[in-house]
From Swiss-Prot:
GO CC, alphabetical: cytosolic large ribosomal subunit
PANTHER family found in the cross-reference section: 54S RIBOSOMAL PROTEIN L1, MITOCHONDRIAL, LARGE RIBOSOMAL SUBUNIT PROTEIN UL1M
Keywords: Repressor, Ribonucleoprotein, Ribosomal protein, RNA-binding, rRNA-binding, Translation regulation, tRNA-binding
Subunit note: Part of the 50S ribosomal subunit.
GO molecular function: rRNA binding; structural constituent of ribosome; tRNA binding
Family: Belongs to the universal ribosomal protein uL1 family.
InterPro entries listed in its UniProt record: Ribosom_uL1_bac-type, Ribosomal_uL1, Ribosomal_uL1-like, Ribosomal_uL1/biogenesis, Ribosomal_uL1_3-a/b-sand, Ribosomal_uL1_CS
Name of the protein described by the UniProt record: Large ribosomal subunit protein uL1
Top-rank taxon, per record: Bacteria
Pfam family, one: Ribosomal_L1
BP GO annotations: regulation of translation; translation
Length: 232
């Protein structure tokens, strides 16, 4: 831990916590810090100008990152008949109905995303206490309850990320890996910011995107000048 501490201390000394860095410089600093022995994720935290306690200001949605996430995902789909075949053809690892529900109840959750056709919600609805706490419960707001299960599977495989504001009014998301080129990370961040803008609640007043900060898994936060994002 001593080496890690010294590394982080050295990096932290390079970062001015009060400064807003242009996106290219911010990405350079974050990638420089990502020197662990694994391919660290590059994460973003966005402080929103909303009241997360108000139900009409809960920001939630999904976006397909143009450069992907760098992570392989296993997809489970609740579907039957033709839609089940479409889900399999699109690349879903697990497809079923009551049999899949029994698998979930048995604790066999070897998948990262769950998608459901609307006509299967009578089955999926009984699994809320299991899937909900794990962030796996299908929801139409993020595109995981849909009649077009094939497209949903393809989006999940292509690098779709879901986002939901926390109690502090902050969105947390992963926009790639340290091994990504800066241009790929920048395009992913822009896609996320665009999606957040589109998801802005009508009742939100004042500045909506208040703060944007980047970090790697084992790194420190670097604040981003939002004007540099708009200039891309």
């Amino acid at each position: 831990m001593a080496k890690l501490s010294k590394r982080l201390q050295a990096f932290a000394a390079k970062v001015d916590r009060q400064k807003l860095y242009a996106i290219d410089e911010a990405l350079s600093l974050v990638k420089e810090c990502a020197s662990a022995k694994f391919d660290e994720s590059i994460d973003v935290a966005v402080q929103l100008g909303i009241d997360a306690k108000k139900s009409d200001q809960v920001v939630r949605g999904s976006v397909v990152l143009p450069a992907g996430t760098g992570k392989s995902v296993r997809v489970a789909v609740f579907a039957q008949g033709e839609k089940a075949e479409q889900a399999r053809a699109a690349g879903a690892e697990v497809v079923g109905m009551e049999d899949l529900a029994e698998q979930v109840k048995a604790g066999k959750l070897d998948f990262d995303i769950v998608i459901a056709s609307p006509d299967t919600m009578r089955v999926v609805g009984t699994l809320g206490q299991i899937l909900g706490p794990r962030g796996l419960m299908p929801n139409p707001k993020v595109g995981t309850v849909t009649p077009d299960v094939a497209t949903a599977v393809k989006n999940a495989k292509a690098g779709q990320v879901q986002f939901r504001v926390d109690k502090a009014g902050i969105i947390h998301a992963t926009i790639g890996r340290a091994s990504f080129e800066p241009t790929a990370l920048r395009s992913n961040l822009n896609a996320l910011v665009d999606a957040l803008q589109k998801a802005k609640p009508a009742t939100s007043k004042g500045v909506y995107l208040r703060k944007v900060a980047l970090s790697s898994t084992m790194g420190v936060g670097v604040r981003v000048d939002q004007a540099s994002l708009a200039a891309q």
